[in-house]
Structures are given as C-alpha cells and as structure tokens.
Amino acid sequence: MSDVVSVRVKPGSKKGPLVETGPDGELTVYVRERAVDGKANAAVIRVLAEHFGVPRSLVELTGGASSRIKRFRIG
C-alpha cells in the first residue's frame, strides 16, 4: 500500500535536514542542498525515507520536480 504526500521543500536551508508538520498537516522539509542538478530532490527523498522508516527505493517523486511543492509516493 502506498501513500501520496504533498511536501513543501526549503532547499539551501541552514535548518536542515529536518521535517516539520504544520498545523494543517502539511509537511515541510528543510535540506541543506541547493536546488541544482536534482541534489535537493535527492536529499528530500533521503530525509523522507528516514522520517517514514522506509528504504529510499520506496520514496518516489511523482510531481513538482522543479517546484517547491512536491508530491511523493511513499511505500
């Protein structure tokens, strides 16, 4: 069973790597990597896999590759 989650990404953050859940349930992921050559996306996948306790291979970017709001399939 897989879930799709919407994530707001903050690349180049000194605060990361960190996952915060807002009052509306939206996830915000802070990563240190800049949004260059897919490095921030790879970092977000790594952070989400750790957050949800699944292997990185089970986290897939399904939408928003070049946007700050992205959709990921987990599981």
UniProtKB/Swiss-Prot annotation:
Pfam families: DUF167. SMART domains: DUF167 (SM01152). NCBIfam families: DUF167 family protein (TIGR00251). Belongs to the UPF0235 family. This is UPF0235 protein Mvan_2846. It comes from Mycolicibacterium vanbaalenii (strain DSM 7251 / JCM 13017 / BCRC 16820 / KCTC 9966 / NRRL B-24157 / PYR-1) (Mycobacterium vanbaalenii).
